């Protein structure tokens, strides 16, 4: 049954960075994931309040967390959660009608009904892959709404889908589909589809993401829209960028192009760009503490799942190309949304933290699992390890800014800058905005 969570030691994906978990660890993980599935809303608040329990538990699991660490992670995250909306069986039945289904997309109070509908569809077809293909990749009117929503709200639904696919869990896949269907839209569908049409009209091969960052910096109208005050994240996309500089960002984003022949390299390029944005968006030269941007962190944490989805031969090559193309384009959008920060390459290249020093990946995984966090740091570190593995063969390319041990340096930075912090000062939010740094001024020792 797709409503049952059953993580198996034989189905932990390819990005496991610890020994196979013992049976008691898997038993506890399944118990906690089932409680989450059966009782908790996928949104802890209506606007971009994403329940991270699945992300947190599964990531820590493959980084080697003990049962005690997993229970602590669950307990830390639980107080912010809320109960699922009520189930309405008659609505679940009506969702089989495509026109009715389409009318309910973006309605957050329909999450439980969407969840039960997708569970029933998976059980009826005895194939979660067929359901994902129809509702995400078929290019039907419904799929053309669901796929953009997978990226909305800082990539949370596609992270959830990626985890479900990685661990082969129909129940988690149903959660991801329901989350995307119920998610508010911030204009990603317009952005993606318009950029896609514009790219189709271009004959040239496309440009690198690093070069396109420079085009954003060199476009005053886009910089101004990205630095508007009073709007955060996706709300800035909907109310500023797509209102005041839509043509400019679409023109630039459409220049990132992926083909079947370039898919592997362009996936690596995207992973690399995300790490570069997260590590290099600093103001240490101006006397501020090192910090990682909250939204660039999400660009990184989601990046690993484009490696995972890219390995799925049941997804057509055409759709795997589209996945990466859209991800790179939205990463460019996020650079604008975060206020077009200056990027300090040298800081990343030479970074060394007081606590983490020369710590290895294995040592870092161990202390991250001890950290009281909602899973963002663990996800970030795991995604960077994947990035290092994927990008190694391409690092000679000029578009690959992050090379060698810089991956580990950025991972150490994530732990170093978040330990002994609270949720309000763990990350800098929109690193290109002057006001974002006001609480991170280095205090004089005089």
Curated annotation (Swiss-Prot):
Its cofactor is NADPH. One of its GO terms (molecular function) is oxidoreductase activity. It comes from the Eukaryota. Pathway: Secondary metabolite biosynthesis. Disruption phenotype: Impairs the production of monodictyphenone, but still enables the synthesis of intermediates until emodin. Results in major accumulation of chrysophanol and its 6-hydroxymethyl shunt product aloe-emodin. It is an enzyme of class 1 (oxidoreductase). PANTHER family: BAEYER-VILLIGER OXIDASE MDPL, PROTEIN, PUTATIVE (AFU_ORTHOLOGUE AFUA_5G03330)-RELATED. This is Baeyer-Villiger oxidase mdpL. It comes from Emericella nidulans (strain FGSC A4 / ATCC 38163 / CBS 112.46 / NRRL 194 / M139) (Aspergillus nidulans).
